[in-house]
Protein backbone atom coordinates (compact mmCIF):
# COMPACT_ATOMS: atom_id res chain seq x y z
CA UNK A 1 0.00 0.00 0.00
CA UNK A 2 2.82 2.37 0.84
CA UNK A 3 4.29 1.84 -2.58
CA UNK A 4 1.00 2.65 -4.30
CA UNK A 5 0.57 5.81 -2.20
CA UNK A 6 4.08 6.87 -3.10
CA UNK A 7 3.33 6.41 -6.77
CA UNK A 8 0.17 8.54 -6.41
CA UNK A 9 2.13 11.30 -4.67
CA UNK A 10 4.80 11.14 -7.39
CA UNK A 11 2.08 11.39 -10.03
CA UNK A 12 0.59 14.47 -8.35
CA UNK A 13 4.05 16.06 -8.11
CA UNK A 14 4.70 15.42 -11.77
CA UNK A 15 1.32 16.81 -12.72
CA UNK A 16 1.14 19.86 -10.53
CA UNK A 17 4.55 20.49 -9.03
CA UNK A 18 5.85 22.37 -12.07
CA UNK A 19 4.24 25.73 -12.85
CA UNK A 20 2.45 25.84 -16.19
CA UNK A 21 4.58 28.74 -17.38
CA UNK A 22 7.81 26.87 -16.67
CA UNK A 23 6.47 23.65 -18.18
CA UNK A 24 5.36 25.51 -21.30
CA UNK A 25 8.77 27.13 -21.66
CA UNK A 26 10.52 23.78 -21.36
CA UNK A 27 8.18 22.21 -23.91
CA UNK A 28 8.96 25.07 -26.26
CA UNK A 29 12.49 23.69 -26.63
CA UNK A 30 11.21 20.22 -27.55
CA UNK A 31 10.74 20.25 -31.33
CA UNK A 32 10.63 16.57 -32.28
CA UNK A 33 6.94 15.57 -32.65
CA UNK A 34 7.65 12.13 -31.20
CA UNK A 35 9.11 13.68 -28.06
CA UNK A 36 6.14 16.05 -27.78
CA UNK A 37 3.76 13.12 -28.12
CA UNK A 38 5.61 11.26 -25.36
CA UNK A 39 5.41 14.32 -23.10
CA UNK A 40 1.66 14.62 -23.68
CA UNK A 41 1.18 11.04 -22.44
CA UNK A 42 2.75 11.65 -19.02
CA UNK A 43 -0.53 12.85 -17.53
CA UNK A 44 -3.63 14.82 -18.48
CA UNK A 45 -2.19 18.06 -17.16
CA UNK A 46 0.93 17.76 -19.29
CA UNK A 47 -1.30 16.90 -22.25
CA UNK A 48 -3.22 20.16 -21.74
CA UNK A 49 -0.02 22.19 -21.46
CA UNK A 50 1.28 20.53 -24.61
CA UNK A 51 -1.97 21.36 -26.40
CA UNK A 52 -1.74 25.03 -25.47
CA UNK A 53 1.98 25.38 -26.18
CA UNK A 54 2.25 23.38 -29.43
CA UNK A 55 3.00 25.87 -32.21
CA UNK A 56 3.46 23.57 -35.22
CA UNK A 57 1.79 20.36 -36.35
CA UNK A 58 2.23 18.24 -39.48
CA UNK A 59 -0.78 16.19 -40.58
CA UNK A 60 0.73 13.55 -42.85
CA UNK A 61 -2.65 12.43 -44.23
CA UNK A 62 -5.50 14.93 -44.50
CA UNK A 63 -8.08 12.16 -44.04
CA UNK A 64 -6.53 10.97 -40.78
CA UNK A 65 -8.36 13.56 -38.69
CA UNK A 66 -10.81 16.43 -39.03
CA UNK A 67 -10.07 20.15 -38.87
CA UNK A 68 -12.40 20.52 -35.90
CA UNK A 69 -10.69 17.74 -33.95
CA UNK A 70 -7.28 19.26 -34.66
CA UNK A 71 -8.45 22.67 -33.47
CA UNK A 72 -9.84 21.24 -30.24
CA UNK A 73 -6.57 19.40 -29.62
CA UNK A 74 -4.25 22.30 -30.53
CA UNK A 75 -6.16 25.60 -30.33
CA UNK A 76 -3.05 27.81 -30.35
CA UNK A 77 -1.36 26.51 -33.49
CA UNK A 78 0.71 29.06 -35.38
CA UNK A 79 1.94 26.76 -38.14
CA UNK A 80 0.30 23.84 -39.95
CA UNK A 81 1.59 21.48 -42.65
CA UNK A 82 -1.06 19.36 -44.32
CA UNK A 83 -0.56 16.56 -46.86
CA UNK A 84 -3.27 14.79 -48.85
CA UNK A 85 -2.55 12.69 -51.94
CA UNK A 86 -0.23 9.71 -51.43
CA UNK A 87 3.41 10.20 -52.39
CA UNK A 88 2.83 7.85 -55.33
CA UNK A 89 0.82 10.63 -56.98
CA UNK A 90 4.14 12.33 -57.77
CA UNK A 91 4.86 9.44 -60.15
CA UNK A 92 1.39 9.41 -61.78
CA UNK A 93 0.39 6.22 -59.98
CA UNK A 94 -2.72 7.66 -58.30
CA UNK A 95 -5.94 8.56 -60.16
CA UNK A 96 -6.37 12.29 -60.74
CA UNK A 97 -9.77 12.17 -59.04
CA UNK A 98 -8.54 10.27 -55.97
CA UNK A 99 -9.39 13.14 -53.62
CA UNK A 100 -7.38 15.57 -51.56
CA UNK A 101 -9.56 18.66 -51.68
CA UNK A 102 -8.42 21.40 -49.33
CA UNK A 103 -11.90 22.95 -49.07
CA UNK A 104 -13.02 21.36 -45.75
CA UNK A 105 -9.75 22.29 -44.12
CA UNK A 106 -9.64 25.84 -45.42
CA UNK A 107 -13.19 26.52 -44.26
CA UNK A 108 -12.30 25.44 -40.71
CA UNK A 109 -8.89 27.13 -40.75
CA UNK A 110 -10.54 30.38 -41.77
CA UNK A 111 -13.23 30.17 -39.10
CA UNK A 112 -10.93 29.19 -36.22
CA UNK A 113 -7.18 28.69 -35.68
CA UNK A 114 -6.95 32.28 -34.51
CA UNK A 115 -3.15 32.30 -34.20
CA UNK A 116 -2.31 30.71 -37.55
CA UNK A 117 0.58 32.46 -39.30
CA UNK A 118 2.04 29.75 -41.53
CA UNK A 119 0.21 27.27 -43.77
CA UNK A 120 1.82 24.58 -45.94
CA UNK A 121 -0.45 22.51 -48.20
CA UNK A 122 1.19 19.62 -50.08
CA UNK A 123 -0.32 17.49 -52.86
CA UNK A 124 -3.78 19.00 -52.42
CA UNK A 125 -6.48 20.38 -54.70
CA UNK A 126 -6.95 24.06 -53.88
CA UNK A 127 -9.53 26.11 -55.76
CA UNK A 128 -9.66 29.85 -56.33
CA UNK A 129 -12.69 29.94 -54.02
CA UNK A 130 -10.65 28.23 -51.30
CA UNK A 131 -7.95 30.87 -51.56
CA UNK A 132 -10.55 33.63 -51.52
CA UNK A 133 -12.03 32.29 -48.26
CA UNK A 134 -8.60 31.88 -46.68
CA UNK A 135 -7.32 35.30 -47.68
CA UNK A 136 -10.43 37.09 -46.43
CA UNK A 137 -9.97 35.54 -43.01
CA UNK A 138 -6.19 35.33 -42.59
CA UNK A 139 -4.58 37.91 -44.89
CA UNK A 140 -3.68 40.15 -41.96
CA UNK A 141 -1.82 37.29 -40.22
CA UNK A 142 -0.20 35.04 -42.81
CA UNK A 143 3.58 35.29 -42.94
CA UNK A 144 4.22 32.01 -44.77
CA UNK A 145 2.02 30.37 -47.40
CA UNK A 146 3.12 27.26 -49.30
CA UNK A 147 1.20 25.51 -52.07
CA UNK A 148 3.53 22.57 -52.64
CA UNK A 149 2.72 20.34 -55.65
CA UNK A 150 -0.88 21.55 -55.50
CA UNK A 151 -3.38 22.13 -58.31
CA UNK A 152 -6.78 23.65 -59.03
CA UNK A 153 -6.08 27.37 -58.64
CA UNK A 154 -5.10 30.19 -60.98
CA UNK A 155 -3.02 33.35 -61.16
CA UNK A 156 -6.12 35.44 -60.39
CA UNK A 157 -6.16 34.04 -56.85
CA UNK A 158 -2.39 34.56 -56.63
CA UNK A 159 -3.00 38.21 -57.45
CA UNK A 160 -5.49 38.34 -54.57
CA UNK A 161 -2.94 36.78 -52.22
CA UNK A 162 -0.25 39.20 -53.38
CA UNK A 163 -2.54 42.21 -53.04
CA UNK A 164 -3.92 41.48 -49.57
CA UNK A 165 -1.33 39.43 -47.64
CA UNK A 166 1.01 42.31 -46.92
CA UNK A 167 2.85 40.53 -44.09
CA UNK A 168 3.78 37.60 -46.30
CA UNK A 169 7.46 36.70 -45.94
CA UNK A 170 7.31 33.38 -47.83
CA UNK A 171 5.26 32.48 -50.90
CA UNK A 172 6.01 28.96 -52.17
CA UNK A 173 4.39 27.48 -55.30
CA UNK A 174 7.01 25.01 -56.52
CA UNK A 175 5.90 22.23 -58.86
CA UNK A 176 2.24 23.26 -58.66
CA UNK A 177 -0.16 23.22 -61.60
CA UNK A 178 -1.49 26.78 -61.93
CA UNK A 179 -3.87 28.12 -64.57
CA UNK A 180 -2.84 31.47 -66.03
CA UNK A 181 -5.71 33.97 -66.14
CA UNK A 182 -3.97 37.27 -65.52
CA UNK A 183 -0.55 36.29 -66.84
CA UNK A 184 2.13 37.67 -64.49
CA UNK A 185 0.14 40.53 -62.96
CA UNK A 186 0.34 38.73 -59.63
CA UNK A 187 4.09 39.41 -59.56
CA UNK A 188 3.47 43.12 -60.09
CA UNK A 189 0.87 43.05 -57.29
CA UNK A 190 3.39 41.37 -55.02
CA UNK A 191 6.08 43.90 -55.90
CA UNK A 192 3.84 46.91 -55.24
CA UNK A 193 2.05 45.66 -52.11
CA UNK A 194 4.70 43.77 -50.16
CA UNK A 195 7.96 45.11 -48.78
CA UNK A 196 8.77 42.28 -46.33
CA UNK A 197 8.96 39.32 -48.72
CA UNK A 198 12.01 37.10 -48.14
CA UNK A 199 11.19 34.02 -50.23
CA UNK A 200 9.39 33.67 -53.55
CA UNK A 201 9.38 30.25 -55.21
CA UNK A 202 7.49 29.28 -58.36
CA UNK A 203 10.21 26.96 -59.67
CA UNK A 204 9.12 24.06 -61.92
CA UNK A 205 5.81 25.71 -62.83
CA UNK A 206 4.62 26.91 -66.23
CA UNK A 207 4.02 30.45 -65.03
CA UNK A 208 5.34 33.22 -67.24
CA UNK A 209 7.34 35.94 -65.55
CA UNK A 210 8.23 39.34 -66.94
CA UNK A 211 11.88 40.26 -66.26
CA UNK A 212 10.71 43.83 -65.63
CA UNK A 213 8.24 42.72 -62.94
CA UNK A 214 10.83 40.45 -61.35
CA UNK A 215 13.33 43.31 -61.22
CA UNK A 216 10.65 45.55 -59.70
CA UNK A 217 10.01 42.87 -57.08
CA UNK A 218 13.67 42.64 -56.16
CA UNK A 219 13.97 46.42 -56.02
CA UNK A 220 10.94 46.85 -53.71
CA UNK A 221 11.44 43.76 -51.53
CA UNK A 222 14.81 44.58 -50.05
CA UNK A 223 14.74 41.54 -47.74
CA UNK A 224 14.42 39.04 -50.60
CA UNK A 225 16.95 36.25 -50.10
CA UNK A 226 15.36 33.37 -52.02
CA UNK A 227 14.07 33.69 -55.58
CA UNK A 228 13.12 30.58 -57.55
CA UNK A 229 11.37 31.24 -60.84
CA UNK A 230 10.19 29.50 -64.00
CA UNK A 231 11.95 29.64 -67.36
CA UNK A 232 13.23 33.13 -68.17
CA UNK A 233 16.13 33.91 -70.50
CA UNK A 234 19.22 34.59 -68.40
CA UNK A 235 20.38 37.59 -70.43
CA UNK A 236 17.08 39.28 -69.54
CA UNK A 237 17.88 38.94 -65.82
CA UNK A 238 21.07 40.99 -65.77
CA UNK A 239 19.38 43.99 -64.14
CA UNK A 240 17.68 41.73 -61.60
CA UNK A 241 20.97 40.28 -60.36
CA UNK A 242 22.58 43.71 -60.15
CA UNK A 243 19.65 44.88 -58.02
CA UNK A 244 19.45 41.81 -55.74
CA UNK A 245 22.15 42.78 -53.28
CA UNK A 246 21.36 40.17 -50.61
CA UNK A 247 20.05 37.31 -52.78
CA UNK A 248 21.35 33.99 -51.44
CA UNK A 249 19.33 31.37 -53.31
CA UNK A 250 18.35 31.45 -56.99
CA UNK A 251 16.72 28.78 -59.15
CA UNK A 252 15.26 28.90 -62.63
CA UNK A 253 16.10 31.18 -65.50
CA UNK A 254 17.08 29.53 -68.76
CA UNK A 255 20.05 29.41 -71.09
CA UNK A 256 17.72 28.34 -73.90
CA UNK A 257 17.57 31.43 -76.11
CA UNK A 258 14.31 30.30 -77.77
CA UNK A 259 15.42 31.22 -81.26
CA UNK A 260 17.86 34.06 -80.69
CA UNK A 261 20.88 33.98 -82.95
CA UNK A 262 24.21 32.69 -81.71
CA UNK A 263 25.80 36.14 -81.87
CA UNK A 264 23.27 37.53 -79.38
CA UNK A 265 24.53 35.27 -76.61
CA UNK A 266 27.04 37.03 -74.45
CA UNK A 267 27.71 35.52 -71.05
CA UNK A 268 31.18 36.93 -70.61
CA UNK A 269 31.46 38.70 -67.27
CA UNK A 270 27.91 37.65 -66.35
CA UNK A 271 27.16 39.02 -62.91
CA UNK A 272 25.72 37.19 -59.91
CA UNK A 273 25.41 38.96 -56.54
CA UNK A 274 28.32 38.11 -54.22
CA UNK A 275 25.83 37.01 -51.55
CA UNK A 276 24.68 34.06 -53.71
CA UNK A 277 25.14 30.71 -51.95
CA UNK A 278 22.65 28.32 -53.61
CA UNK A 279 22.04 27.97 -57.34
CA UNK A 280 19.97 25.93 -59.79
CA UNK A 281 20.04 26.87 -63.48
CA UNK A 282 17.99 25.51 -66.38
CA UNK A 283 19.41 24.18 -69.67
CA UNK A 284 22.97 25.28 -69.00
CA UNK A 285 25.48 23.75 -71.43
CA UNK A 286 29.24 23.48 -71.72
CA UNK A 287 29.63 26.97 -73.21
CA UNK A 288 27.61 28.64 -70.46
CA UNK A 289 28.90 26.86 -67.37
CA UNK A 290 31.97 29.08 -67.24
CA UNK A 291 29.78 31.87 -65.86
CA UNK A 292 29.81 29.93 -62.57
CA UNK A 293 33.56 29.50 -62.27
CA UNK A 294 34.20 32.81 -60.42
CA UNK A 295 31.44 32.00 -57.90
CA UNK A 296 32.08 28.30 -57.34
CA UNK A 297 34.07 28.64 -54.14
CA UNK A 298 31.23 30.53 -52.45
CA UNK A 299 28.46 28.10 -53.37
CA UNK A 300 26.96 25.86 -50.70
CA UNK A 301 24.27 24.32 -52.92
CA UNK A 302 24.40 23.45 -56.61
CA UNK A 303 21.56 21.83 -58.56
CA UNK A 304 22.57 20.53 -62.00
CA UNK A 305 19.58 18.26 -62.63
CA UNK A 306 18.21 20.36 -65.49
CA UNK A 307 21.40 21.05 -67.43
CA UNK A 308 23.04 19.73 -70.60
CA UNK A 309 26.40 19.06 -68.93
CA UNK A 310 28.49 16.01 -69.71
CA UNK A 311 30.47 13.90 -67.26
CA UNK A 312 33.60 15.95 -67.94
CA UNK A 313 31.66 19.19 -67.45
CA UNK A 314 30.50 17.99 -64.04
CA UNK A 315 34.08 17.20 -63.08
CA UNK A 316 35.35 20.63 -64.10
CA UNK A 317 32.56 22.49 -62.34
CA UNK A 318 32.55 20.50 -59.11
CA UNK A 319 36.32 20.98 -58.75
CA UNK A 320 35.63 24.70 -58.38
CA UNK A 321 33.03 24.20 -55.64
CA UNK A 322 34.91 22.90 -52.57
CA UNK A 323 32.43 24.27 -50.04
CA UNK A 324 29.30 22.55 -51.32
CA UNK A 325 26.95 21.21 -48.66
CA UNK A 326 24.18 20.19 -51.10
CA UNK A 327 24.66 18.74 -54.58
CA UNK A 328 21.88 17.56 -56.90
CA UNK A 329 22.75 15.99 -60.25
CA UNK A 330 21.67 13.36 -62.77
CA UNK A 331 23.50 10.10 -63.20
CA UNK A 332 25.36 11.56 -66.18
CA UNK A 333 27.89 12.61 -63.53
CA UNK A 334 29.10 9.00 -63.57
CA UNK A 335 31.57 7.31 -61.27
CA UNK A 336 34.30 9.68 -62.42
CA UNK A 337 32.26 12.70 -61.39
CA UNK A 338 31.44 11.17 -58.01
CA UNK A 339 35.14 10.54 -57.43
CA UNK A 340 35.74 14.25 -58.01
CA UNK A 341 32.93 15.01 -55.54
CA UNK A 342 34.61 12.77 -52.97
CA UNK A 343 37.97 14.47 -53.46
CA UNK A 344 36.61 18.03 -53.47
CA UNK A 345 33.43 18.35 -51.40
CA UNK A 346 34.49 17.44 -47.87
CA UNK A 347 31.61 19.44 -46.33
CA UNK A 348 28.88 17.72 -48.34
CA UNK A 349 25.75 16.93 -46.30
CA UNK A 350 23.15 16.15 -48.97
CA UNK A 351 23.67 14.35 -52.28
CA UNK A 352 20.98 13.50 -54.82
CA UNK A 353 21.78 11.58 -58.01
CA UNK A 354 18.63 11.29 -60.14
CA UNK A 355 18.08 9.13 -63.17
CA UNK A 356 18.49 10.94 -66.45
CA UNK A 357 15.33 10.80 -68.55
CA UNK A 358 16.22 9.36 -71.95
CA UNK A 359 13.13 10.94 -73.52
CA UNK A 360 13.63 14.45 -72.18
CA UNK A 361 14.29 16.18 -75.45
CA UNK A 362 18.07 16.10 -75.51
CA UNK A 363 18.86 16.50 -71.82
CA UNK A 364 20.79 13.24 -72.04
CA UNK A 365 23.86 13.96 -74.11
CA UNK A 366 25.76 11.17 -72.38
CA UNK A 367 24.58 8.16 -70.41
CA UNK A 368 26.09 8.19 -66.96
CA UNK A 369 27.15 5.04 -65.19
CA UNK A 370 26.93 5.30 -61.43
CA UNK A 371 28.04 2.06 -59.80
CA UNK A 372 29.61 0.74 -56.62
CA UNK A 373 32.82 2.53 -57.61
CA UNK A 374 31.30 5.98 -57.26
CA UNK A 375 29.38 5.06 -54.11
CA UNK A 376 32.46 3.77 -52.32
CA UNK A 377 34.40 6.91 -53.25
CA UNK A 378 31.69 9.21 -51.88
CA UNK A 379 31.25 7.15 -48.70
CA UNK A 380 34.95 7.40 -47.91
CA UNK A 381 35.43 11.00 -49.06
CA UNK A 382 32.30 12.74 -47.71
CA UNK A 383 32.03 11.82 -44.02
CA UNK A 384 29.33 14.37 -43.15
CA UNK A 385 26.58 13.09 -45.45
CA UNK A 386 23.15 13.15 -43.81
CA UNK A 387 20.98 12.62 -46.90
CA UNK A 388 21.87 10.44 -49.88
CA UNK A 389 19.51 9.50 -52.72
CA UNK A 390 21.11 7.74 -55.67
CA UNK A 391 20.17 5.87 -58.85
CA UNK A 392 22.77 3.25 -59.72
CA UNK A 393 23.42 0.93 -62.64
CA UNK A 394 25.32 -1.60 -60.55
CA UNK A 395 25.88 -2.19 -56.85
CA UNK A 396 27.75 -4.65 -54.61
CA UNK A 397 27.66 -5.72 -50.98
CA UNK A 398 31.06 -4.09 -50.47
CA UNK A 399 29.71 -0.70 -51.51
CA UNK A 400 26.80 -0.95 -49.07
CA UNK A 401 29.21 -2.06 -46.36
CA UNK A 402 31.38 0.99 -47.07
CA UNK A 403 28.36 3.25 -46.60
CA UNK A 404 27.66 1.58 -43.26
CA UNK A 405 31.28 2.06 -42.23
CA UNK A 406 31.96 5.63 -43.36
CA UNK A 407 28.52 7.31 -43.56
CA UNK A 408 27.34 6.88 -40.00
CA UNK A 409 25.72 10.34 -39.96
CA UNK A 410 23.10 9.39 -42.56
CA UNK A 411 19.51 9.91 -41.47
CA UNK A 412 17.99 9.41 -44.94
CA UNK A 413 19.29 6.91 -47.52
CA UNK A 414 17.56 5.96 -50.77
CA UNK A 415 18.92 3.68 -53.48
CA UNK A 416 17.30 2.75 -56.79
CA UNK A 417 18.91 0.05 -58.93
CA UNK A 418 18.22 0.79 -62.59
CA UNK A 419 17.62 -1.86 -65.24
CA UNK A 420 20.01 -0.54 -67.89
CA UNK A 421 22.31 -3.55 -67.62
CA UNK A 422 21.22 -7.15 -68.07
CA UNK A 423 22.96 -8.31 -64.90
CA UNK A 424 24.48 -6.82 -61.78
CA UNK A 425 27.83 -7.80 -60.32
CA UNK A 426 26.54 -9.37 -57.12
CA UNK A 427 23.26 -10.74 -55.85
CA UNK A 428 21.71 -10.99 -53.31
CA UNK A 429 22.69 -7.86 -51.41
CA UNK A 430 21.62 -9.16 -48.01
CA UNK A 431 24.95 -8.77 -46.22
CA UNK A 432 25.49 -5.28 -47.60
CA UNK A 433 22.09 -4.12 -46.39
CA UNK A 434 22.77 -5.61 -42.97
CA UNK A 435 26.11 -3.79 -42.72
CA UNK A 436 24.59 -0.51 -43.88
CA UNK A 437 21.77 -0.63 -41.34
CA UNK A 438 24.08 -1.69 -38.51
CA UNK A 439 26.46 1.17 -39.25
CA UNK A 440 23.95 3.94 -39.99
CA UNK A 441 22.24 4.01 -36.62
CA UNK A 442 20.74 7.48 -37.16
CA UNK A 443 18.63 6.46 -40.17
CA UNK A 444 15.04 7.68 -40.05
CA UNK A 445 14.14 7.17 -43.72
CA UNK A 446 15.22 4.24 -45.90
CA UNK A 447 14.37 3.33 -49.50
CA UNK A 448 15.74 0.29 -51.32
CA UNK A 449 14.30 -0.22 -54.81
CA UNK A 450 16.13 -2.98 -56.65
CA UNK A 451 15.46 -5.91 -59.00
CA UNK A 452 13.87 -9.27 -58.29
CA UNK A 453 16.48 -11.44 -56.61
CA UNK A 454 18.64 -8.58 -55.37
CA UNK A 455 17.33 -8.90 -51.80
CA UNK A 456 16.21 -12.25 -50.41
CA UNK A 457 13.97 -13.12 -47.48
CA UNK A 458 17.11 -13.21 -45.34
CA UNK A 459 17.79 -9.59 -46.28
CA UNK A 460 14.25 -8.60 -45.32
CA UNK A 461 14.85 -10.24 -41.96
CA UNK A 462 17.98 -8.13 -41.53
CA UNK A 463 15.96 -4.99 -42.32
CA UNK A 464 13.49 -5.89 -39.59
CA UNK A 465 16.25 -6.63 -37.10
CA UNK A 466 18.43 -3.57 -37.67
CA UNK A 467 15.88 -0.83 -38.46
CA UNK A 468 15.33 0.30 -34.89
CA UNK A 469 15.00 4.00 -35.68
CA UNK A 470 13.56 3.99 -39.21
CA UNK A 471 10.16 5.69 -39.49
CA UNK A 472 9.65 5.66 -43.27
CA UNK A 473 10.53 2.81 -45.60
CA UNK A 474 10.11 2.17 -49.34
CA UNK A 475 10.95 -1.27 -50.71
CA UNK A 476 10.73 -2.31 -54.36
CA UNK A 477 11.14 -5.77 -55.93
CA UNK A 478 12.44 -7.32 -52.73
CA UNK A 479 11.96 -10.69 -51.08
CA UNK A 480 11.23 -14.19 -52.30
CA UNK A 481 8.13 -15.18 -50.35
CA UNK A 482 5.69 -14.09 -47.67
CA UNK A 483 8.15 -15.29 -45.05
CA UNK A 484 10.49 -12.40 -45.79
CA UNK A 485 7.80 -9.79 -45.12
CA UNK A 486 6.73 -11.57 -41.95
CA UNK A 487 10.32 -11.61 -40.70
CA UNK A 488 10.64 -7.89 -41.41
CA UNK A 489 7.41 -7.14 -39.54
CA UNK A 490 8.67 -8.71 -36.32
CA UNK A 491 11.13 -5.81 -36.07
CA UNK A 492 11.01 -2.18 -37.24
CA UNK A 493 9.60 -0.90 -33.91
CA UNK A 494 9.51 2.75 -35.04
CA UNK A 495 8.14 2.26 -38.56
CA UNK A 496 5.17 4.54 -39.23
CA UNK A 497 4.99 4.62 -43.02
CA UNK A 498 5.64 1.66 -45.34
CA UNK A 499 5.50 1.64 -49.15
CA UNK A 500 5.92 -1.57 -51.15
CA UNK A 501 6.05 -1.92 -54.93
CA UNK A 502 6.49 -5.00 -57.07
CA UNK A 503 7.05 -7.34 -54.13
CA UNK A 504 4.07 -9.67 -54.76
CA UNK A 505 3.38 -10.69 -51.20
CA UNK A 506 0.00 -12.26 -50.54
CA UNK A 507 -2.89 -10.34 -49.03
CA UNK A 508 -2.71 -12.55 -45.97
CA UNK A 509 0.98 -11.75 -45.41
CA UNK A 510 0.32 -8.03 -45.83
CA UNK A 511 -2.48 -8.18 -43.27
CA UNK A 512 -0.38 -10.06 -40.72
CA UNK A 513 2.55 -7.68 -41.23
CA UNK A 514 0.34 -4.66 -40.59
CA UNK A 515 -0.85 -6.14 -37.31
CA UNK A 516 2.71 -6.92 -36.21
CA UNK A 517 4.13 -3.47 -37.04
CA UNK A 518 2.86 -1.77 -33.90
CA UNK A 519 3.85 1.79 -34.86
CA UNK A 520 2.53 1.62 -38.45
CA UNK A 521 0.19 4.44 -39.43
CA UNK A 522 0.26 4.26 -43.23
CA UNK A 523 0.63 1.55 -45.88
CA UNK A 524 0.76 1.81 -49.68
CA UNK A 525 1.24 -1.27 -51.86
CA UNK A 526 1.33 -1.71 -55.62
CA UNK A 527 2.04 -5.14 -57.04
CA UNK A 528 0.86 -7.94 -54.74
CA UNK A 529 -0.92 -11.30 -55.02
CA UNK A 530 -4.47 -10.04 -55.11
CA UNK A 531 -7.46 -12.25 -54.40
CA UNK A 532 -10.70 -11.82 -56.41
CA UNK A 533 -12.52 -10.00 -53.61
CA UNK A 534 -9.80 -8.94 -51.17
CA UNK A 535 -11.11 -11.13 -48.36
CA UNK A 536 -7.66 -11.94 -46.98
CA UNK A 537 -7.08 -8.23 -46.33
CA UNK A 538 -9.91 -8.32 -43.80
CA UNK A 539 -7.43 -9.74 -41.32
CA UNK A 540 -5.81 -6.30 -41.02
CA UNK A 541 -9.06 -4.61 -39.98
CA UNK A 542 -8.74 -2.82 -36.67
CA UNK A 543 -10.26 0.24 -35.04
CA UNK A 544 -9.74 3.52 -36.90
CA UNK A 545 -7.95 1.79 -39.82
CA UNK A 546 -9.17 2.84 -43.28
CA UNK A 547 -8.47 0.46 -46.16
CA UNK A 548 -8.83 1.49 -49.81
CA UNK A 549 -8.36 -0.53 -52.97
CA UNK A 550 -7.36 1.61 -55.95
CA UNK A 551 -8.46 -0.24 -59.06
CA UNK A 552 -6.04 -0.46 -61.99
CA UNK A 553 -6.69 1.94 -64.85
CA UNK A 554 -5.37 0.53 -68.09
CA UNK A 555 -5.35 3.91 -69.81
CA UNK A 556 -3.82 6.28 -67.27
CA UNK A 557 -2.81 5.17 -63.83
CA UNK A 558 -1.44 1.64 -63.80
CA UNK A 559 -0.62 0.47 -67.32
CA UNK A 560 0.78 -2.76 -65.86
CA UNK A 561 -2.68 -3.61 -64.55
CA UNK A 562 -1.73 -3.69 -60.88
CA UNK A 563 -4.20 -2.67 -58.22
CA UNK A 564 -3.05 -0.72 -55.17
CA UNK A 565 -3.75 -0.88 -51.47
CA UNK A 566 -3.84 2.28 -49.38
CA UNK A 567 -4.42 1.91 -45.66
CA UNK A 568 -4.06 4.48 -42.92
CA UNK A 569 -5.14 5.35 -39.41
CA UNK A 570 -7.99 7.83 -39.24
CA UNK A 571 -9.84 9.41 -36.34
CA UNK A 572 -12.25 10.89 -38.88
CA UNK A 573 -13.77 7.58 -39.98
CA UNK A 574 -14.38 6.56 -43.56
CA UNK A 575 -14.13 9.46 -45.98
CA UNK A 576 -17.13 10.42 -48.11
CA UNK A 577 -15.46 11.58 -51.33
CA UNK A 578 -14.38 8.28 -52.86
CA UNK A 579 -14.25 8.34 -56.69
CA UNK A 580 -15.32 5.31 -58.72
CA UNK A 581 -11.70 4.20 -59.03
CA UNK A 582 -11.34 3.79 -55.26
CA UNK A 583 -13.11 1.00 -53.37
CA UNK A 584 -13.37 1.30 -49.56
CA UNK A 585 -12.73 -2.24 -48.42
CA UNK A 586 -13.94 -1.81 -44.88
CA UNK A 587 -15.13 1.17 -42.85
CA UNK A 588 -13.24 2.39 -39.80
CA UNK A 589 -14.47 0.91 -36.55
Curated annotation (Swiss-Prot):
F-box domain sequence ranges: 18-59
Expression across tissues: Expressed in roots, shoots, leaf sheaths and leaf blades.
Keywords: Jasmonic acid signaling pathway, Plant defense, Ubl conjugation pathway
GO cellular component, one term: SCF ubiquitin ligase complex
Domain of life of the organism encoding this protein: Eukaryota
InterPro entries: COI1_F-box (IPR041567), LRR_dom_sf (IPR032675), Transp_inhibit (IPR041101)
GO term, biological process aspect, one: SCF-dependent proteasomal ubiquitin-dependent protein catabolic process
Residue numbers binding jasmonate: 87, 352, 414, 501
Gene3D superfamilies per record: 1.20.1280.50, Ribonuclease Inhibitor
Alphabetical list of PANTHER family matching this protein: AT02038P-RELATED (PTHR16134:SF119), F-BOX/TPR REPEAT PROTEIN POF3 (PTHR16134)
Function comment: Involved in jasmonate (JA) signaling. Required for jasmonate signaling in plant defense responses. Component of SCF(COI1) E3 ubiquitin ligase complexes, which may mediate the ubiquitination and subsequent proteasomal degradation of target proteins, including TIFY/JAZ family.
Known partners and oligomeric status: Interacts with TIFY9/JAZ5, TIFY11C/JAZ11 and TIFY11D/JAZ12 in a coronatine-dependent manner.
Protein name: Coronatine-insensitive protein homolog 2
Amino acid sequence: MGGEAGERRLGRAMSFGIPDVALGLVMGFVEDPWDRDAISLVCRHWCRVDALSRKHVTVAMAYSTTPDRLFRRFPCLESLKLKAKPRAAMFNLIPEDWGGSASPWIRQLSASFHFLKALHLRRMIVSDDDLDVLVRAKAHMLSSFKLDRCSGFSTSSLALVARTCKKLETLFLEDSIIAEKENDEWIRELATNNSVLETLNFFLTDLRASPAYLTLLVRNCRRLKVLKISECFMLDLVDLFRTAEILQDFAGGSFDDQGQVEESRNYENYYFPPSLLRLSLLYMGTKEMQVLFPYGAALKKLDLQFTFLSTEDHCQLVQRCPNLEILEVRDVIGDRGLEVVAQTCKKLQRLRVERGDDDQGGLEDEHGMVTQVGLMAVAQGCPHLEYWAVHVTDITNAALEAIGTYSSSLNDFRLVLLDREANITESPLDNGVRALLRGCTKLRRFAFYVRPGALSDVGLGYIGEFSKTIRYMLLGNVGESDQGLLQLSTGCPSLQKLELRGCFFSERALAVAVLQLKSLRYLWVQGYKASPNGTDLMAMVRPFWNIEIIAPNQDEVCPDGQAQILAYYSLAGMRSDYPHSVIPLYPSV
